[in-house]
Amino acid sequence: MKRRSKESNYNISSQRRRYREISTREKSRYIDIPLDITVEILKKLPAKSLVRFQCVSKQWSTIIGSRRDFIDSIVARSMTHPQQWWDVLLIFHYQSDKSSFFIFTHPLNTNQELVSIPGLTVDCYGYIRDDLFNHVFVFGYDPVKNKYKVMCLMITKSEEFENACFVFTLRDPKKQWRNVKCGIQHHYPWLPAVCINGAIYYRATEDHGSTFFLVSFDVRSEKFDHVNAPKELIDSKDSTLINYQGKLGFVSYERSVGIWVMEDHNKQGWSKVVDSSIGSGEIVFINKMVICHDTVYVVFFLS
């Protein structure tokens, strides 16, 4: 028995030596890339890959998810090369004893891919009711606290719109939706929204689309506020909020193309940077609702 025990110990120790030798040879094949070069390489990767690569190591997870300069570079890159007609399709299923229905947001792109997101669960128990008219989800970023938040605004059916607001903070240990006070009641958001410098901006209506006003939601303080806006934005349905060189802007395209920019958030002063008539027909606009179809026909006449 002692002899067998000695042979067994010898085999184990020899195997360990071989593993150490193999491990040493394998390590010698790898190149030790400096951290600053690794960061620059990661900055070139798509956002989808960066999310996956957070699992490589704690160091990579910290770089990708917490380093301010790294996050700013990714945001700047996405602003320089924005994706065309991109949106997210979110589907939520609610079932009760009486009814079962689906709620979904509509994507603008025609190439739709339906995927599930592990870990992203919206618990609407106690909030979704039979009188629910609609709801919107808006993604925002607070550059001061370096936090990402999702704001959900629910609208119920009544003679006037009734609002309830909930906020979810990404990477919050509690992982729950918080009910926050909606400071502007009786309004219906008119998307798309835009997040600039820690504030979410969106157009809203309180009379089913007859007149509009501009609303801001401060991502850090989680408070709503009215924003002064030019008459063209208030009166026109055919306008879109944009991020214009880091400032809030909107494009109107009803009878002419115009771009307005809010120079200062505190003073809420606007200036018109583009004003061009399109009455001669050189530019043709298509309603975004028809882009969902496989084929779109544009008929025009050249004299």
UniProtKB/Swiss-Prot annotation:
Disulfide bonds: none annotated. Residues 27-74 form the F-box domain. CDD domains: F-box_AtFBW1-like. InterPro entries: F-box-assoc_dom_typ3, F-box-assoc_interact_dom, F-box-like_dom_sf, F-box_dom. Gene3D superfamilies: 1.20.1280.50. Transmembrane segments: none annotated. NCBIfam families: F_box_assoc_1 (TIGR01640). This is Putative F-box protein At5g62060. It comes from Arabidopsis thaliana (Mouse-ear cress).
